[in-house]
Amino acid sequence: MERAILCALAIGAVLGGLDLLIGNRFKLGERFEEGFKLLGPTALSMAGILCLAPLLSGALESTLAPLWRALGLDPAMLGGILAIDMGGYQTAELLAQDAAIGRYAGILVAATLGCTVTFTIPLGAGMLRGLDAAGFYRGLLIGLGTLPVALLLGGAVSGIALLPLLIQTLPVALFSLLLMLGLKFFAAQSIRAFSAFAALLRWLSIIGLTAGAVQYIAGVALIPNLAPIEEAMKTVSGIGIVMLGSLPAAEVLRRVLSRPLMRLGQKLGMTDASLAALLVGFVSITPVLAMMKEMDLRGQTMNAAFAVCAASALAAHLGFTLSAAPQMILPLLLTKLFGGVLAAVLAVLLTKEKDAGEHASRAD
């Protein structure tokens, strides 16, 4: 299955490259170009954190890791609080007692829970206001509720036995519950905490990038035990190469599925933007958040729920996984697709009919 996925990505790269050669006639060439254009922003956001990964894991090793071991848990799970491409994988790998649990935490947990905490929630809080934000937070509650189920599926597919998988996933379920309670009853305070955490990671990334550049250029170690910046850039480059194929392939998939999804949206009484955003979100969450002002309340809730697991599956997260742990490609995509669809279906079932087709922003 992994081979079939990689072949599909390679075909996407061929289609994008050929279209670029003939003048972007089918609009796939621009998606091909976008893969490389994203290298700069990707490097700026993650290379510095990757350089600092040994220090982050060392800090966790001397603080929380002993408690985790005393509870019978693998310290690798601590890395899952960071996004997969913001040090989550490297931290989990360095802390892991069991390599399989390290991959589970660093790929599956970090690509879902970690991405939600460090990126989706702070970004959404900054972009959305009023009823738009209300639909977004409602969807996050649903998505966080289904997250442990999706992780159990992905962990089982990756080869982890059921009992160890349940034990290691329990802290994730409890943390998801705490996030749900925080967003439900202390939304403003929770958002401030998430935003501060995301800002801290941005600061650390810039510091790590600066120190890594100085060490590479001048041979001066401003920060001891820093991972070489060229290793971080190798990971970033791998993501960019994969996106040369994944972005055109995702565009083809979007075109194939757009009409069936539009018909489904009409049956559910939802706006076109609400259904179209699901396919966009499988590539990147940022444009989905921008589109939420065009959605009805049901669409906002559904897309936010979908994003907890499914965000960026066919772009940065797939590229990172192919570079770091290619054997986890199938578990990653199954976790993201199953979790996203399950959350989206629940969001539709749990929202009222009057929320469909009603433009949330008009009351903002």
Predicted regions and their residues:
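Alpha-helical membrane segments and immediately flanking helix-loop junctions
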Residues: 71-146, 271-325
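Interfacial/capping segments of alpha-helical transmembrane domains
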Residues: 55-74
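Short amphipathic alpha-helical coupling elements at transmembrane boundaries
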Residues: 30-38, 65-69, 231, 259-270
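Juxtamembrane/interfacial segments flanking transmembrane helices
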Residues: 23-28, 60, 253-260
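Juxtamembrane "helix exit" motif at the C-terminal ends of alpha-helical transmembrane segments
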Residues: 56-60, 215, 313-327, 333, ...
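Signature of multi-pass transmembrane helix bundles
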Residues: 1-48, 104-113, 118-245, 326-364
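Long, well-ordered mid-to-C-terminal structural blocks that present hydrophobic/aromatic surfaces
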Residues: 221-273, 280
